[in-house]
C-alpha cells in the first residue's frame, strides 16, 4: 500500500495536466514502513529530457536529476520511495518499457491524462523477480497542516 495525501495527489495531477500532451515524471519522496507500505510526503518533479518528438509517449530522466532528488530527500531525512509519471491519452497501466526500467521496492504511480485532464491515477509495485507489476492500493488522506507554523 502507498499512502498519498491530497496535496501530493493534487501536485501529481497538476504536473501531468500541465505537461500534456507530453509525459511528465518525478520522484516520490517519503518513508518506507516496516510492513512494506510507503507514505509519500511530497513529490520531486523532474524534467522530461526526451527529445521533443518522443515526449508524448516516453519520459527520460537524467541520472544527475535522480541524484539531485536523492540528495534532496536525504537532506530532509526522507527516502525516494518511488516514481510517478503520466500516460497521455493512455490508461494508467505500466507499459513494457515501464517494466524494463523499474525497481522492485519502489511504488510506480501512473496518471492517465485524457484530452488534458487526469482521468485515473493508479499505483503499481513490481514483483521481486521483476516479471510483472501488481496494482498497489492507494490510500488517500487529508493534508494536515501544523497550526503552530
Predicted segments — roles?
Residues 86:
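Residue-level "edge-of-site" marker
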Amino acid at each position: 500500500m502507498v499512502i498519498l495525501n491530497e496535496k501530493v495527489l493534487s501536485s501529481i495531477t497538476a504536473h501531468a495536466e500541465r505537461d500534456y500532451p507530453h509525459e511528465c515524471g518525478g520522484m516520490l519522496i517519503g518513508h518506507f514502513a516496516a510492513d512494506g507500505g510507503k507514505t509519500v510526503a511530497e513529490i520531486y518533479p523532474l524534467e522530461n529530457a526526451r527529445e521533443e518528438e518522443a515526449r508524448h509517449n516516453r519520459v527520460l530522466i537524467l541520472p544527475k536529476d535522480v541524484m539531485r532528488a536523492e540528495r534532496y530527500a536525504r537532506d530532509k531525512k526522507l527516502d525516494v520511495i518511488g516514481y510517478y509519471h503520466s500516460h497521455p491519452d493512455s490508461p494508467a497501466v505500466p507499459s513494457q518499457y515501464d517494466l524494463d526500467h523499474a525497481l522492485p521496492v519502489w511504488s510506480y504511480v501512473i496518471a492517465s491524462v485524457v484530452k488534458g485532464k487526469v482521468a485515473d491515477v493508479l499505483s503499481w509495485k513490481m514483483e521481486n523477480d521483476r516479471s510483472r507489476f501488481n496494482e498497489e492500493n492507494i490510500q488517500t488522506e487529508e493534508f494536515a497542516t501544523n497550526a503552530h507554523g
